């Protein structure tokens, strides 16, 4: 398959090297276009008021891989690849492997998921891969599963246009309990701003935070209750696959507001 791979951790990240090399070694036609530096939690931002530069990168990846480092956001990278760098569209857009989970409401901030979402917006099935640890350096099990999943999709394509958000627990391959189709949960954070003063007396802030609670999504979303939540299955060493789409229309909200009047005066 022809694959485009991006990420938000940057061109030097171990996760994207492990993923891209594994897929190239499996015989796929792999192109990498990703940020030239760390761009985590940039969401779906695009660069509009300055030029975007992309440089060919050699010696980082498998010799069969063509790679570019881009000074834009993750979404910039995918958009640039699809419209300017690639000679023909890929069969799949992949993003990752991210260093850290993208579960629940975290996906709204995620550059990893947004890069994959950009592929889906352009009509290409896409997958975001995340290793649910900020410290583990063992991306091999995640890359192994990614290779298996891509091979499966080559034989049996995704039946509808969607993004698969895949989170892999940070354990050895033999310790993975299985794979489960999941629905998106809710992760609430307590955000703390660390206030500091620079040598010139100017105030600045560092945003820190930790998970406060993991809760069920609202019932009004009409999601099947028999489908487990992503944050729960990963905790039990299952791989989580959550199908996503970009249409954020709240169908229940339309129903609840259908009898409202919205006067202009």
UniProtKB/Swiss-Prot annotation:
Cell compartment(s), UniProt: Cytoplasm
UniProt keyword terms in alphabetical order: Cytoplasm, Hydrolase, Metal-binding, Nucleotide-binding
Predominant location: cytoplasm
Entry's cofactor comment: Binds 1 divalent metal cation per subunit.
One Pfam family from the record: SurE
Reaction it catalyzes: a ribonucleoside 5'-phosphate + H2O = a ribonucleoside + phosphate
Record GO cellular component, one term: cytoplasm
Binding residues for a divalent metal cation: 8-9, 40, 98
UniProt xrefs under InterPro entries: SurE, SurE-like_Pase/nucleotidase, SurE-like_sf
NCBIfam families per record: PRK00346.1-4, PRK00346.2-2, surE
Name the record gives this protein: 5'-nucleotidase SurE
Originating species: Nostoc sp. (strain PCC 7120 / SAG 25.82 / UTEX 2576)
Name of the coding gene: surE
